[in-house]
Amino acid sequence: MFNINRKIRKAILFAGTLPFIISMHGPGRFEEMEKEILHFVNADRKSNGLKPLELNSFESSVAMEHSQNMASGKTPFGHKGMEARIRKINKEMGPISNAGENVAVGQMNASEVVRGWLNSPGHKRNIEGDFTLTGIGYAKDKKGEIYFTEIFTK
C-alpha cells in the first residue's frame, strides 16, 4: 500500500505485504485477471456505498511496467519509484489530487489478490479511498510468480 495526498508525500508506508501463494485455475486466467481484479475492487467499493473505479489504460500501462520491473528484479518488490510513476501519469493525464498503490506477489487468482489487500488496513484504505481511476498490471517472473500492481488516482 502506498498513498500520496495532494502534496505527494514522500513517505512510503508498507501495509505488511506478504507473498500470497495461490494457484491459478486453468489457462486463460492470467489474461482475465485485470478485469477480475477491477470487478472485485468495485464490488467492495459498491458494498461500502462508493462509486466504482474506472479502468484507465495509461495507468494500467504504468502499473504493468512496475510489475515487469519487480518480476525481472530491476526494482525490488514494493513501492520504490512511486513518485516517478505518479509524475508520469500526471504528465500524460493532467493534475492528480490523490494517488495510491497496492502491490502483491505470488501465483494467485484475482479474488485472492483483492482479498489479501482487503485484509490489510493500508491496502483496504486505497481500495476504498477517494479515487476515480485505476490501473492494473501484472507480470510473471522466471519462477512463475506473478507480481501485481494497482494504481489509484483522482
Where are these regions (language model features)?
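Bacterial N-terminal signal peptides
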Residues: 14-20
